[in-house]
Amino acid sequence: MPTPAPHLVDEILEEIFLRLTTPAELARASTACPRFRRIITDRSFLRRHRKLHPPPLLGLVNVDGSFQPAEAPDPSAPLARALADAADFTYSFVPVPSSGIPWHVRDVRDGRVLLEACQVLETLKDMAVCDPLSRRYVLLPPIPTDLAVQEEYPFDIVPILAPIGDDEDDMSFKVICLAIYGSKLTAFIFSSVTQQWCI
């Protein structure tokens, strides 16, 4: 009897692995053999798995930047407690801006936190995106003045993190800044891939 083609076996294994519901189950399966690990760590497989099994809500980041973990009887409570113990929600690993103004949390998405530092009535802000668990950060360059000041100076700029797209790398991110002018609204987009702002 001929052996099945390797790609067919891989496809069957993928379908089996897609039925595993937790990251812990995937991690255990990936340690069984190199073939399982190769299949499970493939980006397209992980994307499909995340679509079928969205990550659990582990907690909330409060306005002051502190983390409120999920509590029992929530099934995510042990993982949430572990996250609270391991991550740095004081953001001490992010350098203080040159202005000396402390960081404030503006948005949280996909495990990343968008921080900003600005004085009252200041529209152009210092911004950073960080991962409190891995303690990595990216300081965003300022929005170029030639982009921000079109016909007039913006009244306010509201930054938000964009959700990760299906075709995007898990390490990349985008920040959207909505600039509010007297008579119009303009969106500026920062991409971690290009490290630049665009309209």
Locate predicted features:
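N-terminal entry/capping and adjacent linker segments that precede and initiate structured domains
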Residues: 1-199
